[in-house]
Amino acid sequence: MANPPSRYDLTGRTALVTGAGGLLGKQHVAALAEAGARVVVTDLALTQAETAVAALKQAMPSADLNAVEINVTSLDSVRAASERLAGRGVTVDILVNNAAIDPKVTSAPGVMHSSRFEAFPVPQWQTEIAVGLTGAMLCAQVFGGAMASRGRGVILNIASDLGVIAPDQRIYRQPNVTREEEQPVKPVTYSVIKHGLIGLTKYLATYWADHGVRVNAISPGGVFNDQDPAFVERLTRLIPMGRMAELDEYRAAVQFLCSDASSYMTGQNLVMDGGRSVW
């Protein structure tokens, strides 16, 4: 029997992470690098990707990290990145679709009003879906399609607990706001996009099952990042474990889903939310 830890080893494989300059994006890169993968660190601007690489290199000086610019909303941009990598002899074995716009909940006048469903701007809807959902589809078309042609690969879509449940708008309420229509809310796009990613996961898992490509999703809960204490208190009341996630708590799950440790798993959504979605 193989030594179980070796099934998590990603040495010799190349992973590409979209939106890698963000809070969790850098954690996904670190997780893959820890497991031995070469990681292509991508973001909308090359400077963002390079900044992420520099920050990660301080903690992981031996990590094999390469910064690449990708606009995930543009098929031409995704194809160009794929061609640049191919020109360097780089084959992407693992795709992590992480790029997204996480609209912030705010009570600022004007911004608050436009975040409510009744007044939600169509251009904002289109922009956020283009990044978070269409972008995942385009990257899967290009990089996943190449995996299917080779007969091997892994795609991991980063969803959310809000792709399993709806946002509880009560946790965003402000006591000093008296008019209901002026209360801040979590905008509609985030939850819709994350639900869509889970659907895309199931579709691609069955579509490419006979081509050796596994496709799974992970739905993380909220990560503590020095948020407003009142908000944290309201949110943690909804979580059986009584706390938000630590920044690095999803690393092992990413390693599991991207490695041979999950070799008989596809089309699944791994929910890691401290129990919030089952309460």
Regions found by a protein language model. Give the residues of each.
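Short C-terminal tail/terminal secondary-structure segment
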Residues: 2-9, 114, 174-177, 255, ...
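Amphipathic alpha-helical dimer-interface segment in Rossmann-like NAD(P)H-dependent oxidoreductases
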Residues: 83, 87, 100, 122, ...
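Catalytic loop of short-chain dehydrogenase/reductase
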Residues: 116-122, 156-196, 201-210
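Short, small/polar-rich loop/turn modules that mediate ligand/substrate recognition or access, typified
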Residues: 209, 214, 265-267
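A conserved structural motif in NAD(P)-dependent oxidoreductases
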Residues: 239-250, 261
